[in-house]
Amino acid sequence: MLVPIPALNDNYIWLYGRANLPIIVIDIPEFTPLLDYVQQHQLNVEALLLTHHHDDHTAGVSLFKQHFPNVKVFGPAETQAKGATEIVNMGILQTEHYHIHVLQTAGHTEQHVSYLVDGHLFCGDSLFSAGCGRVFTGNYQHMFDGLQRLKSLPDDTIVCPAHEYTLANLAFAKYILPENVAIQQHEQWVQKQRVTHQPSLPTTMGREKQINPFLIAQDMETFVAWRKAKDVF
């Protein structure tokens, strides 16, 4: 199963699990939507994975730990102050049932990580559909390198960003790449999804290579110019 639970204004809490196994939860901006879904569907939770320390990804950790005191909360060191109990390192994270690759995707924050499990990429605020996160650290090289790392994943990788930013990102992508037909076509599909309050996510790495300016950018100079332009778009 793969489920994006809407939270706050435009966040998603992602749930992933194989058939008849406990699920993993990725980021938790608030607790109640998660609890409601888990109780309604009678799910067991194996782990909570945090991508970075921002409140709109961690504000539900405290209540989560109260309700699920035996479930480990994984995250980079910067999330320890927000309630992470297990600090992740780059490489392999093994839970009871899941073999998870931890990927360094710093730039949005100093220690932002992404998680790859069974061909599903949970990338927090590093990679969005048709966009990427703001570079709050000022380290554009880290951000560019992290996105290149994600870009190297197979085209059929299922990409699960943490925010419903796709329409706004596509508007900028059209501005930067006005001749890109794939962007125009995908925008039409996303508009139909959003009119009926359906998510535009997940996406795929293959699609993002076609429509995402920050993956299309061939060099650091172009990436930085486009990212700074998006900041004020």
UniProtKB/Swiss-Prot annotation:
InterPro entries in UniProt: Clx_II_MBL (IPR035680), Glyoxalase_II_hydrolase (IPR050110), HAGH_C (IPR032282), Hydroxyacylglutathione_Hdrlase (IPR017782), Metallo-B-lactamas (IPR001279), RibonucZ/Hydroxyglut_hydro (IPR036866)
Top enzyme category = hydrolase
> What domain of life does the native source organism fall in?
Bacteria
Cofactor: how bound: Binds 2 Zn(2+) ions per subunit.
Entry's CDD domains? hydroxyacylglutathione_hydrolase_MBL-fold
Disulfide cysteine pairs (residue numbers): none
Pathway annotation from the record: Secondary metabolite metabolism; methylglyoxal degradation; (R)-lactate from methylglyoxal: step 2/2
Gene Ontology molecular function: any one: hydroxyacylglutathione hydrolase activity
Residues at which Zn(2+) 1 binds: 52, 54, 108, 125
Instruction: For this entry, list what GO says about its biological process.
Output: methylglyoxal catabolic process to D-lactate via S-lactoyl-glutathione
Binding sites annotated in the UniProt record for Zn(2+) 2? 56-57, 125, 163
For activity, the cofactor(s) needed are:
Zn(2+)
Q: Which UniProt keywords apply?
A: Hydrolase, Metal-binding, Zinc
Reactions catalysed according to its record: an S-(2-hydroxyacyl)glutathione + H2O = a 2-hydroxy carboxylate + glutathione + H(+)
Which proteins does it associate with, and in what oligomeric form?
Monomer.
Quote the function comment for this protein.
Answer: Thiolesterase that catalyzes the hydrolysis of S-D-lactoyl-glutathione to form glutathione and D-lactic acid.
**Assigned protein family:** Belongs to the metallo-beta-lactamase superfamily. Glyoxalase II family.
HAMAP family in UniProt = Glyoxalase_2
This chain's protein is named Hydroxyacylglutathione hydrolase
Tell me the organism. Pasteurella multocida (strain Pm70)
Lineage of the native species? Bacteria, Pseudomonadati, Pseudomonadota, Gammaproteobacteria, Pasteurellales
